[in-house]
Swiss-Prot record:
This is Hydroxyethylthiazole kinase. ATP binds at R114, T159. InterPro entries: Hyethyz_kinase (IPR000417), Ribokinase-like (IPR029056). Coiled coil: none annotated. GO terms for biological process: thiamine biosynthetic process; thiamine diphosphate biosynthetic process. It is an enzyme of class 2 (transferase). Keywords: ATP-binding, Kinase, Magnesium, Metal-binding, Nucleotide-binding, Thiamine biosynthesis, Transferase. It comes from Halalkalibacterium halodurans (strain ATCC BAA-125 / DSM 18197 / FERM 7344 / JCM 9153 / C-125). SUPFAM superfamilies: Ribokinase-like (SSF53613).
Length: 261
């Protein structure tokens, strides 16, 4: 009953995300039942991170100053016991992006790293391809994710055709979603925020609750596509937010496809 649990708890998610996706991320979190706050200034990030239920660090439009501020917020979240999710957007595309992510991982106790296959491969010194903020791999995403979790010393989420959640030992794979998600800017970044929201829930099964959140996200995308396939990507974007808001645990039970190993 994770969606119902999320909506009842209405967790505050501190999003230090990129300027391209801020509005979409906030609306997506509101739709699913979380409460977003976007705070970036050095003077307040620690205070905000202390009261938030989870912290998202998304480096999409990074600068040296923004990385410094993310580290301040991350350390504050660590002290408060709140989960920290790193979304290493474009890691592997430039040295600055890759090294900035590695610095965050060194200085902050990151709970989950969520990225596409190319980004995760770049951070864990595995083979992959990154083009701008898009990435791909030739290897098995499960093995990639498990290796990365052990190298990075954090849980890892690799999103793509199959969504993989692992702590390096146990694994949950989700099989929901739709290719049209790749035609709307910000859906990958929103999935990182969704991961942060579900990570904030107090549960005995951390991997399963994160996997559940990603499957729910994919179910919403599938339902949005069925509603708008004769219209196009713009209509899909709106329908997707609507479906996130309407989504129930019964929907996930009926349409969700995932397995654990």
């Amino acid at each position: 009953m994770s969606i119902e649990m999320l909506r009842k708890s209405n967790p505050l998610i501190h999003c230090m995300t990129n300027v391209v996706v801020t509005n979409f991320t906030a609306n997506g979190l509101l739709a699913v039942g979380a409460s977003p706050v976007m705070a970036y200034a050095k003077e307040e990030v620690a205070d905000m991170a202390k009261v938030a239920n989870a912290l998202l660090l998304n480096i999409g439009t990074l600068s040296a100053e923004s990385i410094d501020n993310m580290i301040i917020a991350g350390k504050a979240a660590n002290k408060a016991g709140a989960p920290v999710v790193l979304d290493p957007v474009g890691a592997g595309a430039t040295v600055f992006r890759t090294e900035s992510c590695k610095r965050i991982l060194k200085e902050v106790d990151v709970t989950i790293v969520r990225g596409n296959g190319g980004e995760i491969a770049a951070l864990s010194d595995q083979a992959g391809t990154v083009k701008g903020v898009d990435g791909s791999i030739d290897s098995d995403p499960v093995e990639l994710a498990k290796h990365a979790a052990n190298v990075l010393n954090s849980a890892v989420v690799v999103t793509g055709e199959v969504d993989v959640v692992t702590d390096g030992t146990g694994t949950v794979c989700g099989y929901n979603g739709h290719p049209w998600l790749t035609k709307v800017v910000g859906t990958g970044c929103l999935s990182g925020a969704i991961v942060a929201a579900f990570a904030s829930l107090k549960t005995d099964d951390f991997l399963e609750v994160i996997g559940y959140g990603l499957v729910a996200y994919g179910v919403a995308a599938e339902k949005a596509y069925e509603e708008t396939k004769a219209k196009g990507y713009g209509s899909f974007q709106t329908a997707f937010l609507n479906q996130l808001g309407r989504l129930t645990d019964e929907d996930v039970k009926q349409h969700g496809r995932f397995e654990r190993s």
